[in-house]
Amino acid sequence: MAMFKKRFIKKSEDGKVAKPKRKLDVDGFESDSDDVLEKETKSSSQGIKKHKPINGTKKPTRDVEHGQNSSTGNALSNPSLDQATTDKSAGEKSVGPIKPPPISIKTTTITDFQPDVCKDFLQTGYCGYGDTCKFLHIRDESKQRKPIEKEWETVTEQQKPDKSKEQVPYRCVLCSKDYTSPVKTECNHLFCQKCFMNRYRNLKKPNCFICGKDTGGVCSPVSKKELEKLIS
């Protein structure tokens, strides 16, 4: 006996084998889809009922708030605000000044257009009061008279000025004028020859006018080059 039955496949008019068509049960499919939708709606409604709002929190609404106090509206319109809040919560410090500087703090500058300068020191470079003088000992004018080349030479050579050179006045102390035929005493102080001899002969004061040492009327002439070295 034959175990299997023979199947006869119909051929189309062209001679090709026609594929069998499957029939779908449309009524059953629609009923199944309706059942699935009903189950999903029931489960979603039950889930919403289970979640209760926490005390102190507002329910979300679709009303958009306008202004600076709006939190939901700004968050929806500007997503960058959400990033800023997350950055602050992460602990990042804000950049820039937190508070403006106080208005009470102001800077004031005072310029003295008429300073109290010692007249004797300005004219002659010597003052009898010394460091105890209450006026300023400034030699701005004498500094401007110096040539630039000599200042540059002193900077390059880095020579330390002697105390004797610092104490030499650039004008005669007796007449308050430039030196005319200058002379130097034993104590290395400069005077005009006329002023020194007038003080020694007429006033009969043999002591030095600056240091008070007895000179005995002895002095030595000073050349122009030596005078420039002593004054500069």
Curated annotation (Swiss-Prot):
Keyword DNA-binding among record annotations: yes
Gene Ontology cellular component terms for the protein in this record: Prp19 complex; U2-type spliceosomal complex
GO annotation terms (biological process): generation of catalytic spliceosome for first transesterification step; snoRNA splicing
Swiss-Prot/TrEMBL keywords: DNA-binding, Metal-binding, mRNA processing, mRNA splicing, Nucleus, Spliceosome, Zinc, Zinc-finger
Compositionally biased residues, Polar residues: 67-88
InterPro entries: CWC24-like, Znf_CCCH, Znf_CCCH_sf, Znf_RING, Znf_RING/FYVE/PHD
Zinc finger boundaries on the chain: RING-type: 172-212
Zinc finger (C3H1-type) boundaries: 112-140
A Pfam family recorded for this sequence: zf-CCCH
Main location as per UniProt: nucleus
Region Disordered, annotated ranges: 1-107
Metal-binding found in the keyword field: yes
Annotated localization: Nucleus
GO molecular function annotation: DNA binding; zinc ion binding
SMART domains tied to this protein: RING, ZnF_C3H1
Matches recorded under PROSITE patterns: ZF_C3H1, ZF_RING_2
Binding partners and assembly: Associated with the spliceosome.
PANTHER family per the UniProt record, alphabetical: RING FINGER PROTEIN 113B (PTHR12930:SF0), ZINC FINGER PROTEIN 183 (PTHR12930)
Annotated function: Involved in pre-mRNA splicing.
Family: Belongs to the CWC24 family.
Designated name of the protein: Pre-mRNA-splicing factor CWC24
Source species: Debaryomyces hansenii (strain ATCC 36239 / CBS 767 / BCRC 21394 / JCM 1990 / NBRC 0083 / IGC 2968)
Gene this chain is encoded by: CWC24
